[in-house]
Structure formats: C-alpha cells, structure tokens
C-alpha cells in the first residue's frame, strides 16, 4: 500500500514538495500508533515501513529531456522527435560528432521518441524518455556517462534513410544517465539537401575519380507516372538513372541490350548513381559489355515499393512496365524486345526483379536476382509464416527467432529489431515496408499488420492474403501451366549459403518448387558467403556483377565472346 501511495505522490509537478512531506508524515503517524500495540502489530507496522523505504530507494528517477527549436528553422515544425543516448567509456573518442542507432547492434544506442506538432522557434518541448523508448525506459538505463543527441525527423523517414535533408539536429551533449537531464538539447542545425551526383563516403577513391568523366553518359530519370499520380491524388514520379555506354555517341545506328536494376532496402537515388558510375567505368575499361543500364529507385516514404501493384503503395508495377519502359525506349536506342530487356537486383531489389520476371514474363528475357527477399513464405527469414500459431518473436521452444547471423552466431533478434522499429516511427522500417507491399488495406487506410508488435503473434488472415497474392512459389504452383512458355529458364538466382538474413532457405524452397513443376532452374549457392560479400570473386569486390553482365550479354547477343573472367559460382548440390 505504501509503495503505491509513494508512487502516486512523487508524480507531482517538479518542485512540488507536498508529496514527500505528506509521505513521511504518514510514516511518523504510523510509528506513533504502533507504540503500546501488541508485539505482532508492531512487527507488522515496522515491516510495512521497511517495505516502503525499500520502494523509495528502488524506484528509478523519471528521465525527461527538454528540447528547444533554435535557429534551424524560422517557422514552426512538426515530425518525430528522437533522442539518442549512447554510453561512453574512457576509450571512446571525444568529441562525439553524432549519435545514431546501429543497424545490427540494436542495444548499442538507446532511443526515446514522441510526435511533435507545430513547435515554434524558441519554444521548448518535454520528451518523457520512459513512455516510448528502446531497448528500455531511460530510467532503467545502466547508470553511466552518455552522449546524447536530439533529431527531429520531419518527414518520418528515419526508419528507412536515417537522418536526411530537412531534418533538424542538436549538438551532442554528454550527461550522466539516468537522472541528469538538466541540459537543454537545442535543434540548431538543419541537414542540407544532398547532391545526388556526389559520391557517398564509402565509394572507393579510384571510382570517385571517374565521376566527372562519366557524367556525360549518365542521364537522370524524372518521370511523372499517370497511374501512381491517380492513385495518390498528387504527382508521383519514378526517378533513377540511364547509363549509356561510352561508345553510344560514336555508333548512332547501334541498338543496345538494356539492363533494369534496382536497389535493396535502404538504397536511394544517390546510391543508385554510385552504381551507375561503376557500371559505366566497367564498360569503359572493357570489364563489362556495352549495354544500357537503367537504375530505377524503388524507395518511398513507406519503404521499398518492390514494383508491385499494391493496394497500399499503388500500381508501381504498372508504372514501370506500361509507362516508364515505353517512354525510355522512345528516347534511347534500346533493343526494345524481351531478349534485350534484362533484370538484376540485390536483396529487396532481388525480390523486385524476381517478381517482375514472374509477373511480366513476356516483357523481360531474364532475371538475375541475388540474395532476394523471401520468395516462399514457408521460410520468411527463417520463419514458417504458415505454421499453426506462428510467432515471429519466439520459436516453439521459446527461444528468440534471429533476424541476422554471422558465422552461425545470432547478431540481432527479430523482436529487438521490430520493437526498435516501432519506436523510431510508424512506417519506413523493414517490417512495415513488407506490410505496405504485401498486406491488405485496413479500415483506417493503413496496411493490416502481419504480426502483433507486442507479442509477435502472426495474423493468419493477413498471411492468407500474402499467400494468395505475393508468395512467388505459391503463384508458380498455381499458374505454371500458363507461365511455363514465357518464363521457363529465365530465372538465374544466386545467394550465399550462409546469407546473413537466412535468405538461402527461401531460395532452396523456391528451387524445389520449380523442380517439382519440371521447370528449368538456375540456382547457385555460394559456399560460406553472406549477404554483403556475395559479389566478391577473388580480389574483385564486384566480380559477380561483371560475370552476370556477360551472361546477360550472351543472351541478348548469341555467339558473342566474353573476355576471360572468373566464372560465376556453380550450383551447389541440392540439400
């Protein structure tokens, strides 16, 4: 009773001392009433006092941050306010430039969040770091010295892009947590727009030197889609880059095979440009054949579109195949026939090109997906979504489902990744992105969640919808007779046998399905490779990309000869 009373008293406004005084007054009155009481009553009362004192010392202090809008914006702003806190040790470098979440180590940085509406310049908002936080309420953080930074995610894109243009950030403040939150966090800096023509920081120095030379052959795509614009009620554009070969201008009568590629989750228009420069340089140096490469950005505020005609994201497949491709074939000297329309992509981009090949088999001549997202939902990142009482957080034995691994060891659990995603924002994260593509639309206009974010329990009705519409293996089983003529032999899939996100499991199931249908299959499992080192062949970090390019060219130009390059990995034995 006393601990409950104490909790209710200390939740008064800061500076209100009536609660503690009233509390200790009650303790004293209880002690006085105990005088002269029977021994058992005195013991009972003293135990109650001891329990109350224990409660007062055990309860952690509430952590509230004060965040103000400085000179970063002359007008009021809204968005998702995020506060990041990372523990600092004696060996950590000072000063700390920025505090961000770690994509793999979910517990490396604590995050608290809340929505902010119409915050005016000079105004201050309080963020209670115990209400919406990961991995724990801030009052339960391990006591220590922390680097803290506030970010206002104005377009709610942090789950996908991290901090980006237009977001407002504070300086990094060092403080002791939990408890020491007296220092004001001021949103003083606006992140500027990034130049998509400038290389990202992780681009090799040798490739950066190529940018100026390649510029003339890399052309921006900014195509307003009628179909997507009708769906959203506002102009929506497909963006990307067309890479013409270095010899394009010198051969005005020549047509070229065309490769359509897209990025994985987290990719952007800017990262696609880096890929465009790399492809141009490979053609310039003779390491890859002369083809037109079209990089189409599939990122959106909700995640990746996967070029699916989705009830939530809109008709992205239609926009690409019926609108953009015909427009590009009018502008550039492309083959404009199935054998000259080829597809490749990695991870979520791999799933997208696999889907496009299966859905539009007459339009495209072949797809080379690498490490595609799950194509058979009986193995969705290792989890059978169709199993009775399926749960994405816990296995039947109660142990956590892993999301990522390295050398057989779990790097991050699905539950941790999902819970953090919810704190950072409502959409744009990986699991929310899957739902915006695959799920039915709910009564409130948002996708119906595939699983309960609190318990991890899978919704069988939602999974039934996923199976009916987007399980590639299931679609092949149902429609192979009508697909066989235009699709057979066109899928060339490569994945590491130790894929970081367990995507090799789904690939094995898809291959087994296709073999069971009598389809010609080309599945390759690179022994020991994960998600991020799959393309390395010998000393060449992009060797697999070049090998795939020559395979595509051989399909488009039968009889052509490729230079001596390392052969793509052979198919692994069936398991």
How would you name each of these model-derived features?
Residues 45-57:
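Bacterial N-terminal signal peptides
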Residues 30-47:
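Bacterial N-terminal signal peptides that target proteins for export
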Residues 87-575:
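Non-catalytic cap/lid and distal C-terminal segments of serine-dependent acyl enzymes
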Residues 75-86:
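Short, ordered, surface-exposed loop/turn motifs in non-cytosolic proteins
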Residues 69-75:
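Structural motif
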Residues 60-61:
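Boundary at the C-terminal end of the N-terminal hydrophobic targeting segment
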